[in-house]
Amino acid sequence: MRSGVIAQKVGMTRVYNDAGEHIPVTVLRLENCQVVAQRTEEKNGYTAVQLGAGRSKVKNTPKAMRGHFAAASVEPKAKLVEFRVSADNLIDIGSELTAGHFVAGQLVDVTGTTIGKGFAGAIKRHNFGGLRATHGVSVSHRSHGSTGSNQDPGRVWKGKRMAGHMGQTRVTTQNLEVVSTDEDRGLILVKGAVPGSKGSWIVVRDAIKSGTPEGAPRPAAVRAAESK
């Protein structure tokens, strides 16, 4: 099991394949994505790597985190994410991951925070059909209707779909295809839409349902810290 990467959503565009068909893609950018810490079975009881991405001003970084970054000899990061990995896929601290970590044609799982929509009704939030246009219905055409049963249970069931806050939730979209990568510019082009707004942090992993393709680099496609 390999590590994933932390990327930033740039936006959407389209590219053309060899047949001249256009493919809608989301552009993800890797910015200064480095290994900040390791978790080992002997010391922590599990195996993982902690990645950091982006840049944060020193004055805005808590003192404890400054020491954490200094121990890894990396500059303060804007985003930290921990990835579970197998023991043979541990990555050296300070190494920088590149867009070549993924190969064209492979499937990935993408996690992000969806765009917040504020308070929304049942029709917009859950695709309800609403009430009838006439025949006794007035002023409540877009309401969700009955929410309960009878004297028993005498309450509204937990999880009942009703109006409420829509969006701004952690969502994972599975099995998105990597159309292409640009290692020099740190870009990953993923087919289709990715949850989150422009500029938001996105976590990209090998698709759990399809596994890691044979051509993917192990333990990762890295650029050694000292070569920068």
Curated annotation (Swiss-Prot):
A Pfam short name: Ribosomal_L3
BP GO annotations: translation
Top-level taxon in the UniProt lineage: Bacteria
List of residues that carry N5-methylglutamine: Q151
Tagged with keyword Nucleotide-binding: no
Keywords on record: Methylation, Ribonucleoprotein, Ribosomal protein, RNA-binding, rRNA-binding
MF terms in GO: rRNA binding; structural constituent of ribosome
Keyword check for Ribonucleoprotein: yes
InterPro entries in alphabetical order: Ribosomal_uL3, Ribosomal_uL3_bac/org-type, Ribosomal_uL3_CS, Transl_B-barrel_sf
GO cellular component, one term: cytosolic large ribosomal subunit
PTM note: Methylated by PrmB.
Family named by the database record: Belongs to the universal ribosomal protein uL3 family.
Function of the protein: One of the primary rRNA binding proteins, it binds directly near the 3'-end of the 23S rRNA, where it nucleates assembly of the 50S subunit.
Subunit structure of this chain's protein: Part of the 50S ribosomal subunit. Forms a cluster with proteins L14 and L19.
The name this protein goes by in its record: Large ribosomal subunit protein uL3
Annotated organism of origin: Sinorhizobium medicae (strain WSM419)
